[in-house]
C-alpha cells in the first residue's frame, strides 16, 4: 500500500515537472502604461492594414519592423491570453501557424522568443527615430537574425509577400469585427 502511494506520488511529481514549462509572454513597448488601448485589437487592425498595403512598407524598414513586432506579439498573446482564446478561436490557431512564414521571410531564428525579437526591433526602430540609420543594422544581430545586419535590413526595406500571414491577420480582423457586431446586437436583446 505504501509503495503504491509512493509510486503514484512520484508519477504525479514527474508529470507536474513536465507541465511546469513557463508560458511564453510578450508585450509591445509602445503600450506600456496605457490602459485604454487594447494592444491585441490595435495590432490586429494595424497589422491587417499594413500587410494588405505592402507598397507602403517598401523603403520604410522601421514600419515593417513595427508590423513584425505586432505579429510576434499576436503569435504569443492570442493563443495564451485568457480573453482571446474565446473571442478569437481561429486566430489562436492561424497566428502561431503563420509565424514560421514571417520568420523565414525576415530571417528570424525559428527558436527565438517573441520578446527577444520585439526588443531587437525596438532598438532597430529607435535608431531610425533618433535619425541614426547607420546604427540600425547593429540591432539586427545574428543569431537572432540571419544573416543579420545590412542584409536583414534590406529584407525589412523590401518585405516579402506573406500569404499565410496575410490570411491569418485578415481572419483575425474579421473575428474582431464579428465579435463587435454580436456585442452591439446583443445590447437590445430583451426577454419578456
Regions inferred by a protein language model and the residue ranges of each:
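N-terminal secretory signal peptides that target proteins for export/translocation
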Residues: 1-2
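N-terminal export leaders
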Residues: 5-9, 18
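Bacterial Sec signal peptide processing site at the extreme N-terminus
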Residues: 15-35
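Short, solvent-exposed mixed-charge patches
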Residues: 18, 189-192
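Short terminal alpha-helical segments
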Residues: 40-54
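Mature extracellular/secreted ectodomains of secretory-pathway proteins
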Residues: 50-189
Amino acid at each position: 500500500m505504501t509503495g503504491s502511494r509512493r509510486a503514484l506520488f512520484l508519477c504525479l511529481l514527474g508529470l507536474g515537472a513536465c507541465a511546469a514549462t513557463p508560458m511564453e509572454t510578450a508585450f509591445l513597448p509602445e503600450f506600456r502604461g496605457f490602459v485604454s488601448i487594447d494592444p491585441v485589437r490595435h495590432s490586429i487592425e494595424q497589422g491587417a492594414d499594413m500587410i494588405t498595403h505592402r507598397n507602403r512598407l517598401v523603403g520604410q524598414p522601421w514600419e515593417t519592423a513595427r508590423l513584425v513586432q505586432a505579429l510576434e506579439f499576436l503569435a504569443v498573446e492570442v493563443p495564451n491570453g485568457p480573453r482571446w482564446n474565446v473571442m478569437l478561436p481561429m486566430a489562436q490557431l492561424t497566428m502561431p501557424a503563420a509565424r514560421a512564414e514571417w520568420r523565414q521571410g525576415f530571417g528570424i531564428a525559428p527558436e527565438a522568443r517573441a520578446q527577444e525579437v520585439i526588443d531587437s526591433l525596438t532598438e532597430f526602430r529607435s535608431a531610425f527615430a533618433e535619425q541614426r540609420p547607420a546604427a540600425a543594422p547593429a540591432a539586427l544581430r545574428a543569431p537572432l537574425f540571419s544573416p543579420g545586419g545590412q542584409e536583414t535590413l534590406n529584407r525589412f526595406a523590401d518585405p516579402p509577400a506573406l500569404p499565410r500571414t496575410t490570411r491569418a491577420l485578415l481572419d483575425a480582423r474579421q473575428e474582431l469585427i464579428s465579435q463587435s457586431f454580436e456585442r452591439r446586437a446583443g445590447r437590445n436583446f430583451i426577454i419578456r
